[in-house]
A protein has these predicted regions:
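P-loop NTPase catalytic core of nucleic-acid-dependent motor ATPases
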Residues: 71-181, 185
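AAA+/SF3 P-loop NTPase mechanochemical coupling elements
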Residues: 175-182, 216-234
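Short glycine-/polar-rich loops that comprise or flank the Walker A/P-loop
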Residues: 182-184, 209-210, 227-230, 246-252
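Conserved AAA+/SF3 P-loop NTPase catalytic/coupling segment centered on the Walker-B
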Residues: 184-207, 241-247
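A short helix-turn-beta junction within AAA+ P-loop NTPase domains corresponding to the substrate/partner-engaging
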Residues: 241-261
Length: 263
């Protein structure tokens, strides 16, 4: 493995070419490797075959397992987090935006509650990106008629489409981590729309989790996958929450009114 790792670290073509994506839990190709490949950053089996061919032709290294193990080590030594990099690249121009954001885009009331709810949600999203697994168990719920732009708002808030998902359908699926993997903001729409007392309790329990224990198919041992995402809800009805004597503090509803939006 040592010889293969040395090649990944110092070869002009391979050095810095693969990196471990801390958001997706996958290895990415982050610079050209001398052959045509798909636009996706994630390493594929075809990528690994080209890399093995390169090591065989140039260094007479042929052990598939050792090359794969060395590539994994090299990637982890060159890890990165795309959401953190994105957030660190932003420069504030001094203009306050959070206070009137939901009013501007969705026509929500421009009051203190709306401001504090969105501020809390954004702080939770940022904290989860920089400190995976931190405690954050509330959900911003946008309530309004169909076509009001609720889902679009969450998608745009994520920054990139691949950091957003609305594909979370079941909470008791053993593969639920795969639905969270690689996403920063996740919308729960169908579950909120059909919520009853039992399902609300399930959602509250799900929101309180700080990690999933999951074994990625190629791994030997299961690992704690600390949460890096936050959850938003959308509903067409303001009374989407059933009566709960223990309180529904985890759900922060905001009524939207697109007719009053400024865009």
């Amino acid at each position: 493995i040592k010889n293969c790792l040395t090649v990944f670290q110092h070869d002009p073509l391979l050095s810095g070419a693969i990196a471990y994506n801390l958001l997706t839990d996958r290895t990415d190709i982050v610079k050209p490797l001398g052959y045509d490949r798909s636009p996706s950053a994630s390493m594929t089996d075809t990528d690994m075959k080209y890399i093995r061919l390169y090591l065989e032709e140039n260094y007479d290294l042929t052990s598939e397992k050792k090359i794969i193990d060395a590539a994994d080590l090299a990637a982890h030594q060159n890890s990165y987090h795309p959401v953190r990099d994105y957030l660190n690249s932003l420069t504030w121009d001094g203009t306050e935006r959070i206070r009137y954001c939901l009013h501007h885009f969705l026509g929500a009331e421009a009051d203190e509650y709306t401001f504090q709810v969105l501020r809390l949600f954004l702080l939770g999203a940022i904290h989860r990106a920089f400190h995976p697994g931190c405690k954050f168990e509330v959900m911003l719920c946008l309530v309004g008629g169909q076509g009001a732009g609720k889902s679009t708002f969450f998608r745009l808030l994520a920054g990139k489409d691949e950091w957003f998902s609305d594909d979370l359908r079941k909470l008791d699926d053993e593969n639920v981590y795969r639905k969270l993997q690689g996403h920063w903001i996740i919308e729960m729409s169908e579950m909120i729309a059909t919520a009853n007392a039992k399902s609300i309790e399930e959602i509250k329990s799900f929101l309180s989790r700080q990690k999933e224990v999951y074994k990625i198919p190629y791994e030997t041992h299961p690992a704690d996958r600390l949460r890096q995402c936050v959850f938003g809800g959308t509903s067409n009805a303001m009374d989407f929450l059933p009566l709960d004597r223990s309180g529904n503090r985890r759900f922060l509803p905001v009524q939207v009114c697109p007719e009053q939006a400024e865009v």
